[in-house]
């Protein structure tokens, strides 16, 4: 299960590469919605199934 502070991977369909980021928030709205920061100033929002836990 993904938790705040975990390092996750996302397979970016636009750049055809894998991007790694840190989970900054988890929201429960009919499922788990996860905010991830990839090193820039804003977080991106994902459904849990689109992310893989690395560490």
Predicted regions mapped to residue ranges:
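Basic/aromatic-rich interaction segments and small domains that mediate binding to polyanionic partners
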Residues: 4-52
């Amino acid at each position: 299960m993904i938790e705040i502070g975990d390092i996750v991977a996302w397979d970016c369909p636009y750049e055809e590469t894998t991007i790694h980021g840190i989970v900054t928030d988890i929201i429960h709205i009919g499922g788990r919605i996860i905010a991830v920061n990839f090193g820039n100033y804003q977080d991106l929002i994902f459904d849990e199934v689109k992310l893989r836990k690395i560490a």
